[in-house]
Amino acid sequence: MVFLDPTEISFPDPEFFDSENGLLAVGGDLSPDRLQFAYETGLFPWFNPGEEILWWCPDPRFVLFLEDLKISKSMKKVLRDEVFTFSENTCFRTVMEECRNAYRKDQDGTWISSELIDSFVELHKRGSAKSIEVWQNDELVGGFYGMQIGKVFCGESMFAKVSNASKAALIYFVKNHPELEMIDCQIHSEHLESMGATMISKKNYLTILKKQA
């Protein structure tokens, strides 16, 4: 594990630095420039409130290749019935705040701090961070946000206030962004596995990511 200098934007190269649980570095800050560099390098922040910032690059990595997307019969009906409408990048900060407040069985979203939100909003203004919004009767009921690095979208967090909203968001995003090659889902979830996400080695992940430079 490497302890980062908050005055210098650098990370250990994950290609040559291994750890048993994927934790590569501690410390630094959550500035927009550091976050941008982290995602370009293959790392992402994930930590508990009050702790130092932890930077991860797990091996294996959980990803969704767009051609592997699975849409269940029930979801096809939801989409066919136009239960939801969708938008992109219309309320980025609100999507992050909803992700922070969302209930999660195995974790909470409180690591999405106000500082992190402010930095991501700046990255959104720069065009790197993006959001997908799901609406029902003019109410925001689901969505997600993340960072786009070339043809790789690094999904950060999602929320759903009604059934199927987050699944619909992902399907919409994949269908409307054929230019993408892969969605980085970071760590395993049954929800995303059911939609086609799979594990690949860190080496393969970094190979794909480096092609985006």
Regions found by a protein language model. Name each.
Residues 1-213:
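N-acyltransferase acceptor-side catalytic subdomain
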